[in-house]
Amino acid sequence: MSRLNNKKQILIIIILSAVLILLIAALIILTNHGRTQDKADTATQSSAETAVTAVSTESETESATGVPKTTAAETEPATVVDSEAERDAYYSALVTEAQASGRKIVYLTFDDGSGTLTPTVLDTLDKYNVKATFFVVGNYSPSEDFARTEYNDIISRGHTLGIHSFTHSRANIYESFDAFKADADHMYNYVTELTGRPPRFWRFPGGSATSFADSRMKSDYIPYIESLGMTYYDWNVSSGDGSGNITRDKVYQNVINGVTNKDISVVLMHDGSGHDETVAALPSILDTLINEMNCLIVPITASTTPVQSQF
């Protein structure tokens, strides 16, 4: 009986020891989990603080330059509408403030790209922290890959991308409504596919007053462009670079003289093939407009009052 009692006591001790070991193990596990969670919380807090710092830094940069930064989020389809609305509001406020103080407003527009001269134009605009508007022609680019790169570069640098037809062949485009519709649809879909954004701005080849279109411009072509959700823009200052041979000095004089006589100028220039003199004149034009004439140079947005020919 004594031996049996001893065995029972030993068994109880073993069981109690096992339970104690399990309790100690559980305590260790819980302690380690708490430390891991603390580290995770610290990391999360650190990430949040980093994000706040990044946003603050970006805001300070925007304030210093006067130009809203284009963020990666703006390239996402879900935020396109919001970012465009914010951009419109930003430039609308700048224009309102400038007009109240008596400053001239200038919209620089470039037709017939994107070609091999477009990258140089973009770099020059960057040097002067100026945003412009590009009305591009589909088949004037060396290739579709080139067009994709340049169209998206125009957008990512904060400029406005508009369209100027796919072929720019006025004789063919304005031959009939069906021909016009086919070209406009082609370019609209082409730009949407390459950029992920449907275009909102259109410039008629030759302008809306072109003799190729006659009365059909008002009755057919303009209503169709508007049915696509686009606004068309003409110009009220011409650089004269579309007429063939012209020197950089003459391009400069045409632009500066035109802007001098207007409170609001929509300037027509070209960045397509053969317009090297325009590209060469651009730094002098920007220097005079900014440093001598104190003009506000902004891109066309939805809030911009269109300059359009009167019918």
Identify the residue ranges that each predicted region occupies:
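A short glycine-rich beta-strand->turn/loop micro-motif centered on a GG-aromatic cluster
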Residues: 134-138, 294-306
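Catalytic domains of cell-wall/extracellular-matrix polysaccharide-remodeling enzymes
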Residues: 168-268, 272-291, 303, 308-311
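Residue-level detector of anion-binding/catalytic polar loops
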Residues: 131, 160, 231, 295-296
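Active-site beta->alpha N-cap acidic-glycine motif
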Residues: 80-198
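Helix C-cap/helix->beta junction micro-motif
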Residues: 128, 157, 228, 292-293
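Gram-positive cell-envelope targeting signals
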Residues: 1-59
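Generic alpha-helical hydrophobic packing signal
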Residues: 11-12, 19, 29, 153-157, ...
